[in-house]
Amino acid sequence: MFLGTLVPFLFVLTVVVFVHEMGHYLVGRWCGIGVRAFSIGFGPELIGFNDRHGTRWKLCAIPLGGYVKFVGDMNATSSQPTSEELETLTDEERKVAFHTQAIWKRAATVVAGPLFNFLLTIVVFSVLFASYGRYVAEPMVAEVTADSPAAKAGIQPGDRFVSVDGSKVETFGDVQRLVSGRAGDTITFVMLRDGKEVTVTATPQLMEQQDALGNKVKVAVIGVVNNKELGQPRLITYTPVGAVAAAVEETGHVIQRTGQFLQRFAVGREDKCQLGGPVKIADMAGKAAKLGFEWLVQLVALLSVGIGFLNLLPIPPLDGGHLLFYGVEAVIRRPVSERMMEMAYRAGLLLVLCFMGFVFWNDLFGC
């Protein structure tokens, strides 16, 4: 049982971290930046080797992340070295040091990590869509739950969803996607009834459901049901190009939902138990592996978006924090002062550690 959870968890996390760090590495090398180390994991090195460029590739004992250490980096977070630390570099090292490069090279190298995460998700979805296709159903209402938001809004069996808050819908899944993350929001629905469009408003409410992995999740619903007779479920098959286009669209939806969730979570409008850390991810990986490899790679795709999105938040020492400093540097035309950088990194690191502590607490005791 333990290995049945641990092995899938390590697979999922290692793939996501490797792709993220490979983004930093490849773009950094393309920009002419020297790389001292590429590490999967933290702590003591388990195995490793040096390549012909002098980069140390290694696997470390604590598999909860990874890093690329560029020439000039004084730690794994690529924080700005002090002037005294830069003086310890040789002239050759200064030429390829990360922090001596043009702003656009540093920004491109930093943003490449999250972008590679998004690309990984697109690749996974593309392969899944091309291999298995996708089942969809017409956006029809077969039943309306009594006393539900839909019933109070006047939605009736036989109605067809046309749009949700101005977004056109083509499938019942589109309706679920646009509603599921908006509990407590007043949403405008345009329905097609007897050949005429009818506009109604409803406020979704949270309902606890079980997802495909058996986890209890809370999603916003309005209380409508689709069925085979009205929904007419069908399998959509894709050409390779069509699969990529659908994957890009689906990845965009996942990114949008992730941002929407974090925004609502920050103001207390989401259940704290919906946010988990390594323990929850490990549990999900174990369950996904039991259902089949395609479920495991779907988890890779979803986690990859989450890691990419979180890293873009403008908080030092995350990638987004670095990008924020580069933006300020571009505006004021000089690097941010060492004192300001140090204060920002300390505050950001404290915030990140508090967040990590929160999700660990959720995993072990809170939920």
Swiss-Prot record:
Superkingdom of the source species: Bacteria
Location in or out of the cell: Cell inner membrane
Single GO MF annotation: metal ion binding
Stretches assigned to the PDZ domain: 121-196
GO CC annotations on file: plasma membrane
Key word Transmembrane helix present: yes
InterPro entries: PDZ, PDZ_6, PDZ_sf, Pept_M50_Zn, Peptidase_M50
Record-annotated active site: E21
Membrane-crossing segments per the record: 108-130, 291-313, 343-365
Key words, A-Z: Cell inner membrane, Cell membrane, Hydrolase, Membrane, Metal-binding, Metalloprotease, Protease, Transmembrane, Transmembrane helix, Zinc
Binding site for Zn(2+): H20, H24
Topology in the lipid bilayer: Multi-pass membrane protein
Cofactor needs: Zn(2+)
Biological processes annotated in GO: proteolysis
Top-tier EC class: hydrolase
Enzyme Commission (EC) number: 3.4.24.-
Similarity field: Belongs to the peptidase M50B family.
NCBIfam families, per the entry: RIP metalloprotease RseP
Annotated protein name in UniProt: Putative zinc metalloprotease mll0638
Protein species of origin: Mesorhizobium japonicum (strain LMG 29417 / CECT 9101 / MAFF 303099) (Mesorhizobium loti (strain MAFF 303099))
